[in-house]
A protein has these predicted regions:
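RNA pseudouridine synthases
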Residues: 1-123, 129-135, 206, 212-219
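Short histidine-centered loop motifs in beta-beta connectors
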Residues: 144-147
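Trp-centered recognition loops
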Residues: 139-142
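Loop/turn elements at beta-strand to alpha-helix junctions within RNA-recognition modules
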Residues: 65, 149-150
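Residue-level recognition of short loop/turn positions
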Residues: 108, 150, 196-197
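Short beta-strand segments enriched for Tyr within beta-sheet-rich domains
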Residues: 71, 152-160
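Pseudouridine synthases involved in rRNA/tRNA modification
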Residues: 1-12, 18-23, 137, 159-222
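A sequence-level detector of short linear motifs
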Residues: 113, 155, 201-202
Length: 222
């Protein structure tokens, strides 16, 4: 499988991760993005963030330990901006909505919304913006932009399901009726400082599912 490069220089490489491909895997018989990128650049690479296997979109790697350290520091300090595109079930009443919850991971590899006082509870925050909807659809669906403010396990899927707008195709957090093909979730845009020259880097991938709702790639700056 040939990887799709979005950006590359001497210090970093950004690629598109298709839905269904693991970011990393311990199974030798399964393809994963880390191995494919390492084979492409013919040197060790350092994964900066992860995407769940059903999720598509932008994936960032460093080509050296020094570059990785700089990017990981930005990630830990919340300085890497992450914007997602998703299709959710239903119609959002508010054009822009901020969600703040506490969530925790379960033994079944799921996450649930919980109380702040619960053991292992972690703060989860994001901002959702309505972009377009299918007004003639029998079951209304809405394209949204999501600014991910914290990076928790299955965060977007859990929080959107929690307000009654599960992601289309979400077999874990949606209802049986929601199981329509692939999960409609894409890591659309990353904004970060280059680890060597400190210039602002913006990388994007516009997914096919979004093109059914809008004609050009959106500018997400909320």
């Amino acid at each position: 499988m040939k990887i799709e490069k979005i950006y590359e220089d001497n210090d970093i490489i950004v690629v598109y991760k298709p839905a269904g491909i693991a970011t990393q895997t311990a199974r030798l018989t399964e393809p994963d993005m880390e191995t494919m990128v390492r084979n492409e650049v013919k040197k060790p690479v350092f994964l900066i963030h992860r995407l769940d296997q059903p999720v598509e979109g932008v994936l960032l790697f460093a080509k050296s330990k020094e570059a990785a350290a700089g990017l990981e520091k930005q990630l830990q300090n919340g300085q890497i901006e992450k914007y997602y595109l998703a299709v959710v079930n239903g119609d959002l009443e508010e054009p822009v909505l901020r969600l703040d919850n506490y969530i925790k991971k379960t033994k079944e590899n799921k996450s649930v919304i919980c109380e702040k006082s619960d053991k292992d509870a972690k703060k989860a925050s994001l901002i959702v913006k309505k972009l377009a909807d299918q007004t003639n659809a029998e079951n209304k669906k809405t394209l949204v932009g999501i600014h991910l403010l914290t990076g928790r396990h299955h965060q977007i899927r859990v929080q959107m399901s929690g307000i009654g707008h599960s992601l289309v195709g979400d077999k874990k957090y949606g209802t049986i009726k929601d199981n329509e093909g692939a999960l409609k979730l894409c890591n659309y845009c990353l904004i970060f400082k280059h680890p060597t020259n400190n210039k602002t880097i913006t990388v994007k991938y516009w997914p096919e599912f979004a093109k059914e709702y809008i004609n050009e790639a959106p500018v997400l700056d909320f």
